[in-house]
Amino acid sequence: DIEDFYTSETCPYKNDSQLAWDTCSGGTGNCGTVCCGQCFSFPVSQSCAGMADSNDCPNA
C-alpha cells in the first residue's frame, strides 16, 4: 500500500497521485511524497521530477 510505504515520522506524505512535495516536519528540507518517500536536508523537488521511485532519488 503506497500510503503505508511512504508514511514516516520524519517525512509525512501527502495523499496525492502525482509527484507532490511537502515540508519536512523538521522544516529544513523537502519531502518526496511519491518520488522519494523520504526527507532530504536540501531541496530535491527539481532533482526528483520525473523519477519513479526511491532507487532513482539522490542521496541525502
From Swiss-Prot:
Q: Where in the cell is it found?
A: Secreted
Q: Where is the signal peptide?
A: none
Q: Name the cystine pairs.
A: 11-39, 24-35, 31-57, 36-48
Instruction: Cite a GO CC annotation.
Output: extracellular region
Give GO terms: molecular function aspect only. Answer: pheromone activity
Gene3D superfamilies, from UniProt? Answer: 1.20.50.40
- Per the record, the major location class is secreted
- Task performed by this protein: Mating ciliate pheromones (or gamones) are diffusible extracellular communication signals that distinguish different intraspecific classes of cells commonly referred to as 'mating types'. They prepare the latter for conjugation by changing their cell surface properties.
Specify the protein name.
Answer: Mating pheromone En-2
Keywords from the UniProt entry: Disulfide bond, Pheromone, Secreted
Domain of life the protein comes from = Eukaryota
